[in-house]
């Protein structure tokens, strides 16, 4: 199940080496504007060579750390997953000073042990989208993204960011999984049962609609990226008579029930990420991009 509302927070702090540490965190919210968790909030309209991002950047502070909030599907949720301008979103965050991205995503479970209400720190993905541009290096802007980029996608997510999130989940005593493979589908429809079962055969644990190409694009920009999966349902693969299959109403209800703990995880994680020395990680990420160009 894909998220209904998705927000990205971007956290930046200046270090001695004069580069910013930013984390983008995506967030589902129904009837709640995440600007409420920001202090000194202000709105900034930006543009990129790929057009405008999904919404204005909302700048402020969380726990004393500079943050930026961006709604992936726009604040009114009028942009379906296929039409999100992923390239503009990630580039807008990069150009705002982002170097580290933490995302959250509502997702369905393909595995009995991954129960609704639990969280998962994603560690791999399977891309089953069909309509989305997967790269910045497609020749459309050779002045900025020349050549061809053959980006290695193992690991698919930043291990450093994952470790911080896992440690914070443990500290908060949350029910979570420290690994999960997620399959991203095109949407906006949910899977058929045959599709759901086929994804199980691929050894996917979870299913959503937006991790791809977002994780790939962040990596092409040299931005370490991690994602928190918020498990809301069991998709439609269960065959017991009392099985409840995915629908919008049940997903929203489960998300609302877990909003407080996800917010707590984000707010408590931000100072830990801010305290981490990202210099070598950023250098390694940027070197990987350079070495992936042909």
Q: What is the predicted role of each segment?
A:
Residues 156-200:
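Active-site rim beta-loop-alpha module in soluble metabolic enzymes
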């Amino acid at each position: 199940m894909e998220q209904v509302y998705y927000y990205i927070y971007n956290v930046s702090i200046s270090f001695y080496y004069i580069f910013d540490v930013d984390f983008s965190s995506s967030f589902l919210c129904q009837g709640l504007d995440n600007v409420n968790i920001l202090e000194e909030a202000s709105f900034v309209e930006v543009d990129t060579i790929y057009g405008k991002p999904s919404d204005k950047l909302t700048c402020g502070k969380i726990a004393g750390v500079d943050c930026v909030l961006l709604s992936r599907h726009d604040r009114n949720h009028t942009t379906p997953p296929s039409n999100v301008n992923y390239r503009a979103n990630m580039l807008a965050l990069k150009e705002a000073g982002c170097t580290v991205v933490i995302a959250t995503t509502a997702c369905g479970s393909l595995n009995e042990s991954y129960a609704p209400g639990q969280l998962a720190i994603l560690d791999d993905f399977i891309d089953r989208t069909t309509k989305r541009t997967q790269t910045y290096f497609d020749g459309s802007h050779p002045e900025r993204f020349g050549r061809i980029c053959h980006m290695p996608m193992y690991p698919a997510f930043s291990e450093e960011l994952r470790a911080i999130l896992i440690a914070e989940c443990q500290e908060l005593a949350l029910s979570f999984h420290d690994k999960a493979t997620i399959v991203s589908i095109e949407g906006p429809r949910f899977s058929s049962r045959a599709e759901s079962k086929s994804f199980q055969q691929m050894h996917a644990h979870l299913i959503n609609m937006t991790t791809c190409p977002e994780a790939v694009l962040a990596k092409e920009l040299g931005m370490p990226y991690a994602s928190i999966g918020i498990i809301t349902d069991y998709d439609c693969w269960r065959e017991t008579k009392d099985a409840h299959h995915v629908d919008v109403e049940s997903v929203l209800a489960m998300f609302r029930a877990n909003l407080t703990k996800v917010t707590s995880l984000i707010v408590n994680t931000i100072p830990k990420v801010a305290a981490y020395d990202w210099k070598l990680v950023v250098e390694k990420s940027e070197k990987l991009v350079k070495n992936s160009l042909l």
